[in-house]
Amino acid sequence: MLESHIELEVPSIIMFDPENPGEELTDVSHNDIASVQLNFHGPFSGSAVLVFPSESVEKLVTALTGEKPDSEGFAKATSETLCEVGNILINAVMGSIANLLATQIDFSTPNYKEGKFTDLIKSKGSKKAMTFLLIRTNFKVQDPQISGNVFLIFELGSIGDLLTAIDKL
């Protein structure tokens, strides 16, 4: 899509409390972000959220659509583009997990949101008891420089099911 080298790496996996994200998340916790969320169901349930800092959003949308940030159609292009990119990346991450665990995971349609990261995770955590697992998947594009993160948010109990499945490997 971008005709540029794309790098996905997983430098860390962190569990955290949505009320107190901790030092590991200072680079995203108080900044404006754009996110795409897909809920998933299977042997474990929750949400996968792809988070981009606002400066990466502008670069990504411009690179993929040609729309400029000050153009009339940029907001619509942003929502549509990030939903598509989020769908692809999240399905790749979750598909790899499902393949590794020899199971099937079903997804909802992508949902696009903008705002502060702390507001996003607090609103997500307030609906049900949740365990937040950050599989910090760095999404990097060399030219233009774009980065993002994938967060996995599990319903209470589902994280135990995931860990049990991993232990069986």
How should these model regions be labeled?
Residues 1-169:
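Composition-driven recognition of glycine/serine/threonine/acidic- and proline-rich low-complexity segments
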